[in-house]
Amino acid sequence: MSKAILDVCCGGRMFYKNKQDERVLFCDKRELETTLCDGRKFVVKPDMLADFRNLPFDDESFALVIFDPPHLLKVGDNAYMALKYGKLTPEWKAELGRGFDECWRVLKVAAHLYLSGLRLT
């Protein structure tokens, strides 16, 4: 793997000032192009389609993994917040646990995992 950073839930890359940062492999389980209720275009276009619960990478592949998973429980499927941030399933505890396991697995020794603050709403 030639990239040092893995973002496993990149979504619309809102985390980044440079949304084309060459150091980052942007992954998400979905692709989306839509117009939000306020008229702005919103695009989810990962470099690679991948599910954070089952990452297609070798052990110890990345120096930094960014894990900013969906955090919404009670929101409609087509709601503005669901489109932008994703939506948890009823099995969210097990799914996030599996995601953590996968993030740790693909991290190099003495590397860093960045977890964006989870606030379940």
How does the language model describe each region?
Residues 1-121:
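Class I S-adenosyl-L-methionine-dependent methyltransferase catalytic core
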